[in-house]
Swiss-Prot record:
Organism, as annotated: Leuconostoc mesenteroides subsp. mesenteroides (strain ATCC 8293 / DSM 20343 / BCRC 11652 / CCM 1803 / JCM 6124 / NCDO 523 / NBRC 100496 / NCIMB 8023 / NCTC 12954 / NRRL B-1118 / 37Y)
Family matches, as HAMAP family: MutS2
GO terms for MF: ATP binding; ATP hydrolysis activity; ATP-dependent DNA damage sensor activity; endonuclease activity; mismatched DNA binding; ribosomal large subunit binding; rRNA binding
Function: Endonuclease that is involved in the suppression of homologous recombination and thus may have a key role in the control of bacterial genetic diversity.
Annotated keywords: ATP-binding, DNA-binding, Endonuclease, Hydrolase, Nuclease, Nucleotide-binding, RNA-binding, rRNA-binding
PANTHER family per UniProt: OS10G0509000 PROTEIN, OS10G0509000 PROTEIN-RELATED
Biological process according to GO: mismatch repair; negative regulation of DNA recombination; rescue of stalled ribosome
A Pfam short name: MSSS
Protein name: Endonuclease MutS2
Keyword hit for Iron: no
Length: 800
């Protein structure tokens, strides 16, 4: 990628923001070296790294990296068997401790099942070499500040103990001189140190009376710093102990350096991985700062930026726009007056493309797609170029000439005010010729111009689309909204009229205007009016659709309520019938018992035998209502009052789904069509829908009939399936399982579109739903809901 376009599109300013989040030298080196690349596999890998890091940032606050020093020079010295200083060893020890901490961090995430959602960072963490024995040796011997600990060796601890003893003895002896008779010889009753020896500040005139060794004097010469003769021997012994301490410290450092030397390659690998984690952390935190999203990469170079804004603008006030290029057209011509936002629009497309090819998330409010370009060229106008000043026509042309030598079908070209800076007629002609040349080379182009001659360019060139920036004539202010398909409209006369010019001036101006220009402006005005009308109608349709869905949901709830009431009525009726039968049976048994007793007393045999009496009792038993509706033959027979016939609307009891009878097979089974499915069903498993309706009485019957009349052609199954699924508050795995089950039900009921409500929250569930829908074959398309319908807290799904 050429370096000029990185400067022109302010790519380095994005990298500068990235550096705000870095804490390691290797991470900074990686950020400094960041460039757009063209390998789609590496780009997707980098984007997935950023996605993993964003998930860790949301769930754990990021990868817990400490600030690390650059230990690469230390490792090079170890490779030549040099002995490192305590500070250098402490810095290596800090890296090793961080290595262990990061390794344990990812192991814990894996144990918590979070690691299953991390596609690449877990694998990188598994390459860390923790070196526990070496880490422990350094941690025992040297603290984080570079001081050698007493526990570094037995000898060092012993020598330091003796040093402390001698220092205390010397201090006690010196304190005696600050009191009593000798105190009068001192400038101040304090003990100080000169040349590593304990001394007292003695007045110069008492030098002979005090005695001892003079080590220093004050600037005035009035005070001498004298070591009393009584502590000279102790001080000499203390110096000897300090020499031993230094020798032992050096031995410890040499021993630790020798222990580290075989592991320099592993430590260097750890440094690289930790630095890369620092860089990935920074990418995630930059994405969070910018409120950026992960783009999809299109190898066909189909760019679709949905609700995109320039990442260097304040996202709270920036106007987001939809920009598409490369699908049905490869050239966009943005016409219209200056100051309307044309330049920032083309810069947005160019910079977001560079960011995505660098593995960075892009500033869009809805899922978007970027291409893969070997080169991106940009010729940006002078007054609006932030970093580059190309002020003359010749410099623009020289820049474009250099581009043409490198343009092919894998190039994105950005022109700002193409052909400006010269005679308008010649400039417009040259602009058209340049655009034709670039198009013949197969490049993808987005260009801005204020030449009216180019307004017709998009209509008579293949794979070319007109566009413009919306201008509010009422407020005389640009809206910065990007409008595809409509060329820029000249508003000069309309603005002049609103500002107070009389009809005579406006009329004279119109008379001087070329008639074809007036016709073109009128045509553009008509297109804009039609577009506004379509937009208004779409909003009304969306509002009506939402109201219809709400009514459908209410009707579905009412139907469910009626079905429950019906079930209660049937249950109460069955209980009452069973009660009557039980009472009748009891009376019959009493009657039979009396007959038997009477016959026994009379010793007679009547015509009514014992078997006949039992048979009559059995008939009474059969009157009892069966508790299981599926096994109750009387109720089943009642449900099949009419003969089944093809075309009948029926209910399959085992599936609780409605369908239509197609034909009856020889084996007695019926072929039933339920939504997009067809299956064979036993006749006993089929209930006519009309029997269900007729079983209801009174007010419940009327309400049920009204519901059935108002449901759509897909029947009661469609009405009972809601057009939305609320996953808020549901755990991640359970939510995806529920989503899969819901899509099955919606497809079976032939419902589309449907709304998946996942909320905003941390964004983990939203990302999970998006990934699920992207790979699901049942999904035709999906997008976030409109801002007034939940925004990115809900996803609208079109099913196949």
């Amino acid at each position: 990628m050429n370096q000029k376009v990185l400067q022109t599109l302010e790519y380095d300013k994005i990298k500068s923001q990235l550096s705000d989040f870095l804490s390691t030298p290797i991470g900074r080196q990686e950020a400094d070296a960041l460039q757009p690349i063209t390998d789609v596999h590496i780009i997707n890998y980098w984007l997935q790294e950023t996605a993993d890091a964003m998930m860790i940032d949301r769930l754990k606050g990021g990868i817990p990296l400490a600030k690390l020093a650059d230990i690469t020079p230390h490792l090079k010295r170890l490779n030549i068997q040099a002995s490192l200083s305590a500070t250098e060893l402490a810095e290596i020890g800090n890296v090793l401790r961080n290595t262990s901490a990061i390794s344990n961090f990812f192991i814990q995430m894996k144990d918590e099942s979070i690691g299953e959602s991390l596609e690449v960072l877990i694998e990188q963490a598994e390459q860390l070499e923790t070196l526990p024995e070496v880490t422990k040796s350094i941690q025992t011997a040297i603290d984080s500040t570079g001081r050698i600990n007493d526990e570094a060796s037995y000898e060092l601890k012993s020598v330091r103990g003796k040093i402390v003893g001698h220092e205390n003895a010397i201090k006690n002896k010196m304190q005696e001189f600050t009191k009593g008779k000798t105190a009068q010889y001192l400038s101040d009753p304090i003990v100080t140190i000169r040349s590593d020896r304990y001394v007292l500040p003695v007045k110069a005139e008492y030098r002979s009376q005090f005695g001892g060794v003079v080590h220093d004097q004050s600037q005035t010469g009035l005070t001498l710093y004298i070591e009393p003769q009584a502590v000279v021997e102790l001080s000499n012994k203390l110096s000897e102990l300090r020499v031993k301490e230094s020798a032992e410290e050096q031995r410890v450092l040499q021993e630790l350096s020798a222990e580290l030397e075989p592991h320099t390659n592993e430590i260097q690998q750890n440094v690289q991985i930790l630095g890369h984690f620092d860089f990935v952390n920074a990418k995630a935190r930059l994405a969070a700062r910018l409120d950026a999203m992960q783009p999809t990469v299109s190898v066909e170079n189909h760019i679709s930026l949905r609700q995109a804004w320039h990442p260097l603008l304040d996202k709270k006030i920036a106007v987001a726009n939809d920009i598409s290029l490369g699908d049905s057209y490869k050239t966009i011509i943005i016409t219209g007056p200056n100051t309307g936002g044309k330049t920032i629009t083309i810069k947005t497309l160019g910079l977001l493309q560079l960011m995505a090819q660098s593995g960075l998330f892009i500033t869009t409010r809805q899922p978007s797609t970027i291409g893969i370009f070997d080169e991106v060229f940009a010729d940006i106008g002078d007054e609006q170029s932030i970093e580059q000043n190309l002020s003359t026509f010749s410099s623009h042309m020289a820049n474009i000439v250099s581009m043409l030598d490198h343009i092919d079908d894998k190039t994105l070209v950005i022109f700002d005010e193409l052909g400006a800076g010269t005679d308008p007629a010649e400039g417009a002609a040259l602009a058209i010729a340049i655009l034709d040349k670039v198009a013949s080379l197969g490049a993808y182009t987005i260009a801005t111009t204020h030449y009216p001659e180019l307004k017709l360019y998009g209509y008579n060139r293949p794979e070319t689309k007109n566009a413009s920036m919306v201008f509010d004539v009422e407020t005389l202010q640009p809206t910065y909204q990007f409008l595809m398909g409509v060329p820029g409209q000249s508003n000069a006369l309309a603005i002049a009229k609103r500002l107070g010019f009389g009809e005579d001036v406006i009329g004279a101006a119109m008379a001087l205007t070329d008639e074809s220009d007036q016709d073109l402006n009128n045509m553009i005005a008509d297109l804009v009016a039609q577009r506004d009308e379509v937009k208004k109608n779409n909003e009304e349709l969306r509002s009506q659709l939402k109201a219809t869905e709400e009514k459908s949901e209410a009707l579905s709830e009412e139907q469910s309520k009626l079905e429950k009431e019906r079930a209660h009525v049937i249950l109460d009726a069955k209980n009452e019938a069973n009660h009557i039968v039980a009472a009748t049976k009891k009376q019959a048994e009493q009657l039979i018992s009396e007959i038997r007793k009477e016959r026994l007393r009379a010793g007679q045999r009547g015509e009514l035998t014992e078997q006949e009496l039992q048979a009559r009792k059995g008939k009474l038993d059969q009157l009892r209502q069966n508790d299981s509706l599926e096994k109750n033959k009387i109720l089943q027979k009642a449900k099949k009052v009419k003969e089944l016939a093809p075309g009948d609307e029926i209910t399959v009891r085992s599936y609780s789904q409605q369908g239509t009878l197609v034909k009856k097979h020889k084996n007695g089974q019926w072929e039933v069509e339920m939504g997009i499915l067809k299956m064979l069903v036993d006749e006993d498993d089929i209930v006519k829908t009309e029997a269900t309706v007729k079983a209801q009485k009174g007010k419940a019957k009327k309400k049920q009939q009204k519901i059935i009349r108002k449901t759509t052609s897909s029947g009661s199954t469609r009405a009972s399936v809601k057009s939305s699924l609320d996953l808020r508050g549901v755990r991640y795995e359970a939510a995806l399982t529920e989503l899969d089950r819901y899509l099955d039900t919606a497809v079976l009921a032939n419902i589309s579109p449907v709304e998946i409500i996942h909320g905003k929250g941390t964004g983990a569930l939203r990302q999970g739903v998006t990934e699920f829908l992207r790979s699901d074959r049942r999904v035709k398309s999906y997008h976030f809901a409109s801002a007034n319908a939940g925004g990115d807290g809900a996803t609208i799904v079109e099913l196949k």
